[in-house]
Amino acid sequence: MMQCVRRCSFICGAVLSILLLLCSCQSGAGQLILPDNVPSENTSQGKKELLAALNQEYFDQFSSPNHFIQGSDDAAKTVFLYLKQYSGDDINKAVEALTENPKDDRANCADDVLRIISPSPSETYWVSYSFLSADMLEDGVLKENAAFGSVAKDLIGHRRFLVLSEAFHPAASQNAGFAVGVIGGQALVVAVFVS
C-alpha cells in the first residue's frame, strides 16, 4: 500500500514538473521572460550558444563566418504572440503561417506581421522557427549547454522573407532575435533576422 502511494506521488510530481516547464516557456523581449524564481543573468547564455550554432551551420553551408549577430528580440516576440493568437494555439496552423506563399515567396503571415512591426524600408526581414525538445530548455529558457546544431539547421532552412529591401546585400550580417514559447503543447523558438 505504501509503495503504491509513493508511486502515485512520484507520477504526480513528474506530471506537475512537466506542466510547470510547459507553462513557464514564454516569449521574450530583450531577455526572455522568466518565472519570478529564475535569475535573469542566465537568460543570455543559451541564446549566445544558439547564435554560435547558427554561425557554425551557416559557415558549413556558405563559408561565411559570423554572419549572424545578436539583435533585438522585440520583432521575434511580436511574431510569436501573433502566431499564438492567430493559430488559436494550434501548432499546425502556426507553422502554416510561417511557410512560404508561392505567390510572392514571402511567409504566409508576412502582411499581418508587417502591419504590427512596421519595418524600416531599408531593412530586409526574415522569419523562421524550429521545434525544441525538452532537453533544450531549462526553466522555460534556452539551456546553456544544449546542442543547438539541429535547431540552427532548421532556423536556416525554414527562413522565409517577411519583406525584401532594395538595399539588401546577401553577404551583409543579419541581426537575429529570438522568442521561445509553447503553441499547442509544442515548444519552439521563433527567430526574426534583420539585415
Task: Identify the function of each model-found stretch.
Residues 100-195:
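A well-ordered secondary-structure block
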Residues 30-117:
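Short, well-ordered surface patches within globular domains
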Residues 9-10, 50, 163:
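Sequence-pattern detector for short linear motifs
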Residues 2-12:
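Bacterial N-terminal signal peptides that target proteins for export
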